[in-house]
């Protein structure tokens, strides 16, 4: 597998700043945890899992200091992808056992950071192929499962799908949701979601870039066209030209013109 000779050196004539950086690096290393024999960087601050929302990105950033640990923050999600293509929204260690959790998506800051590791790790072709396989399978899963009403727009089914903990716009939607069909009898969900559409777009855009790297012009054009199809649907279905913004649509296809208290204030 990939190996990289990475490291970071910080120099300053300011002794206070030098000590501050040293202590910050020491604190960060406390967030390196053992997941079944593999070191990973957890979020910290009491968050002891790795979430798809943040930690592939966090790992890619940390890889310049510790490549093996940073790489594992992406590899763990790739290794624990289900046979149907779904990627766990989080991975935990429970009673000493690594447990992938499929009860939410929890964002999708994964494709681009994972591709960054390809370059940082010396352009390993096997890793690139594994990443492509992961993204293609997840994109296929999304379109097979998350367009329950067939309107061509992918859906969020619970608050944790988009990382919007306690979001009022979700109304009575569940926090996590483990089933492969949408919850029934809820006020808003399934919601046609710009977030979940962006998950597909990110997969397809990155797959086009992987095809370019691999010298496959035909596949590059195909994935680029598929990415544009997602983008076009988002614009045609979710964009509000008068307001200059996108808005999700609820289960009845009504535009969700939700604003937070902060957005209504004069701040």
Describe the residue ranges of each PLM region.
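Short linear sequence elements within intrinsically disordered, low-complexity coil regions
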Residues: 15, 52, 132, 162-165, ...
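Non-catalytic carbohydrate-binding regions of carbohydrate-active enzymes
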Residues: 32, 42-45, 86, 92-95, ...
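Flexible, active-site-adjacent loop/turn segments at secondary-structure boundaries
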Residues: 8, 15, 49, 85, ...
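Extended, well-ordered alpha-helical scaffold segments
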Residues: 16-24, 66-79, 124-143, 199, ...
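The feature captures the catalytic groove of carbohydrate-active enzymes
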Residues: 89-109, 140-225, 249-262
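Substrate-binding groove/exosite segments of carbohydrate-active enzymes
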Residues: 3-121, 125-128, 136, 247-267
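A generic short-segment signal for beta-strand/edge and adjacent turn/coil regions
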Residues: 26-28, 168-170, 178-179, 227-237
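A generic alpha-to-beta junction signature in SAM-dependent methyltransferases
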Residues: 81-82, 146, 238
């Amino acid at each position: 597998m990939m190996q990289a000779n990475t490291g970071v050196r910080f120099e300053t004539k300011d002794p206070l700043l030098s000590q501050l950086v040293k202590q910050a690096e020491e604190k960060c290393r406390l967030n390196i945890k053992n997941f079944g024999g593999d070191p990973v960087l957890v979020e910290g601050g009491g968050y002891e899992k790795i979430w798809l929302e943040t930690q592939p990105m966090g790992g890619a950033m940390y890889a310049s200091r510790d490549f093996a640990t940073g790489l594992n923050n992406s590899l763990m999600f790739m290794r624990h992808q289900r046979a149907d293509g779904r990627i766990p929204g989080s991975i935990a260690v429970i009673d000493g056992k690594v447990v992938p959790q499929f009860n939410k998506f929890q964002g999708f800051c994964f494709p681009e950071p994972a591709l960054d590791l390809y370059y940082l790790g010396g352009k390993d072709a096997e890793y690139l192929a594994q990443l492509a396989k992961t993204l293609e399978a997840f994109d296929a899963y999304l379109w097979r499962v998350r367009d329950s009403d067939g309107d061509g727009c992918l859906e969020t089914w619970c608050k944790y799908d988009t990382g919007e903990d306690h979001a009022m716009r979700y109304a009575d939607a569940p926090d996590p949701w483990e089933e492969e069909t949408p919850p029934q009898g809820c006020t808003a969900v399934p919601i046609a979601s710009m977030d979940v559409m962006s998950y597909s777009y990110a997969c397809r855009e990155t797959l086009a870039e992987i095809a370019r790297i691999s010298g496959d012009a035909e596949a590059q054009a195909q994935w680029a066209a598929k990415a544009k199809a997602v983008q076009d649907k988002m614009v045609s279905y979710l964009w509000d030209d008068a307001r200059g913004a996108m808005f999700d649509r609820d289960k009845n296809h009504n535009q969700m013109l939700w604003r937070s208290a902060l957005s209504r204030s004069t701040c």
